[in-house]
Structure formats: C-alpha cells, structure tokens
C-alpha cells in the first residue's frame, strides 16, 4: 500500500495533457516524461522532458520511426536528478514493454497496476486463455511468426481474420484479411510493426470501451464509450487507427449489465487497481467481445471527467492508496467527444491556442508530417450528434489554418 502522503506525480507516456491537467487541478505537483512535448503540457507541468524537441520550421518527425520506449527511462532519470517525485502515473505507450515498466517502477513507484499485473493482461494469447476459462466472450486468437503459420491458423479460425502486432497501441498496424491472398499481402504490412503477429477472428460490430475504477475488492464502471477508429475526416491513415471517442456509448443501456459483469470478473481475477479500460467490439446481438485491456489511464480521460463531473486522478489515487471509490451522482445526460486530428499533408502549424477546445497543441510554426498527430479537440453537448458535430466543425476550422510545406 502506498504512503498516503503523495504530493508530486510524474506522468509518463504519449498522451499526457489531460492526465497532467487532471492531476494539477486537484493540487498535485506535476512532472512529465512525454513523447511530443506539446505547448499546453509545458504550461501545466513544473518540469517536463520530451522525446521531441519542437522548434519553429523543424519537423516533429514520424512516430513509428522515432518511438523508442527505453527513452522514457532516460527522461525519468533526468527529471529525478533535480526533483523529488513520489509516484508515476502511466498513460499509453508502454503497456507491452514490461522490462521498461519494471525499471521505471524501481526508479519511482508506479501508482496503479504493478508491471507484473500489466503483463498478466497484456501477454497474449495467455490472457485470452484466461478469458476462456472465465467464460468471457472474446475473439479466437493465436500468435504466429510467419505467413505459412498464419494461413494455417486463419483456415482453422475461419475468415475474415484480423492481423495485428502482438505489441502496440492506438490501432496501429491492424489489418483485416478475407482470403489467403489478402492475408499474405496484409501480413507483410503488419510485420513492419512487430515480428510476432496475432491472428484473430474478426467480430463484426461497433467499437467501444469500458472505463472503470477498481480498489482491491470493489469494481465500479464509470462509463461505456464509443470508440472512433480510422475516421476519414480526421485524416487518420491507419484503417483501425485511434481517432478519439464519444462518451457515453449511444447504446450503453443495452449492454451495461454485461459490461459490469466483464469488468468485475477481469479486475478481480487479475488484481487490477485504479483507472483501467477494456476495449470491446459489440456484436449485432449486443454481445461485448473483449479485445484488450488498457491497464492505465486511457484516452477517454477528459471526456469521462466532463460527463461524470469527477476528477479521475483524484479518484485513481483514492482507489489505489485509500481503497475507496467515488460516489456517482445522478446528473443531466451530457455527451463529450474527443477527436484526434492528423495532418492531411506535410504542414506548418499556426498558433492553435486560439481554439479553446484544442488539446495536445504543437508549438506554433512547427512542421507536422502527413498522417502524424496534429492535435485533439474535446467538446460536450446535450446529445451525441451535437457534441460530435461541434467537434467536426472545430476540426474543419483548424484544418483551414494549416499551411502546406514542401519536403525541401
């Protein structure tokens, strides 16, 4: 159990603005070991270190080429040389790098799931074997290393199949194959992301997620969320790339009981604690199929806070340190949308702080490469459509401010 006197927190990962903001809002001293080094994160933190050093007229590079998880260790060590930090809060990016998590945890304790617990829910296909034992719906999954083995497994599972890297996040490198010919072609594309590949039965349905909090013996669903994947109007180039979310999921009432059962069974069986997420596909029969666990803060963070009017970092600390979960008050139904925008071409970015709803804001006059993250937008409204249309309208305005840049 953590010492209850936690005052300073280090946010670590690639999606930190909302997490750092939530921590600062309730009085914590906030530090960050970040990837992008965005403008709004700099203004929140006492001190931060980032992989990318954003500068006017300089490219922010390409994530898939520049992302190296071990760099977060170096950034953390650098911050610890001059600052006293009590605990780490994890965002996305390091879920599948268990050695890195262990080393981070040795430097500063991770407030939340231990590296061993993270490994137990992220190591596939062992995790899916446990789900089968628990009777939790999930797509049939196998790990392969070559296309011959992939074809054999796909024939046994039955087409269509999903091909994905065994390690990754944000839907990067995920493909669908409807035949052995497609499998051969798509397999080579996925190999770029990882040498170990998952072949998974494709479940046709709506992409969703569960956000929940857990203490050592109690689990509470916060929200069921709609996931936005591969949305064309955000210029996301990956077919299953994460483009944001809408909270809550529009048909949440039809699946809430099943989702509660799934979250409780998984959290208690694996010993999950604090803020966690479960990615799902909801079939046409309204059966939630578990796709993966996100055993740390999720990209839905600010939307969940807006809908429930809670502070998620405070709730996470209370769950992990004190063992209690927040009371949920009945409120008027609010919908909150987060859109992640990607560069439609190589662009020069203006000052995006003029957009109140913009988050993850790059420094003015930096260069963003085609298909790379540009910024995100968070809106809310009394209906799903109003919230989404508001976000799309702001996205259109932001895209209108960008200036194309040549590759010279």
Residue ranges and their predicted role:
Residues 214-219, 283-286, 321, 344, ...:
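Short acidic-glycine loop/turn motifs at beta-strand connectors
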Residues 1-122, 126, 133, 145-152, ...:
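ATP-binding N-terminal substructure of ATP-dependent carboxylate-amine bond-forming enzymes
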Residues 144, 174-179, 212-215, 249, ...:
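Short beta-strand-to-turn element immediately C-terminal to the catalytic PLP-Schiff-base lysine
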Residues 10, 150, 314-408:
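Peripheral (often C-terminal) accessory segments that flank ATP-dependent C-N-forming ligase machineries
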Residues 204-208, 212-271, 294-318, 330-331:
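ATP-dependent carboxylate/phosphate-activation module, predominantly the ATP-grasp catalytic core
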Residues 127-132, 199, 316:
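Structural element of the ATP-grasp superfamily
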Residues 272-285, 328:
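A short glycine-rich, hydrophobically flanked beta-strand micro-motif that places a catalytic Asp/Glu
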Residues 137-139, 160-162, 174-209, 224, ...:
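Conserved ATP-binding module of the ATP-grasp superfamily
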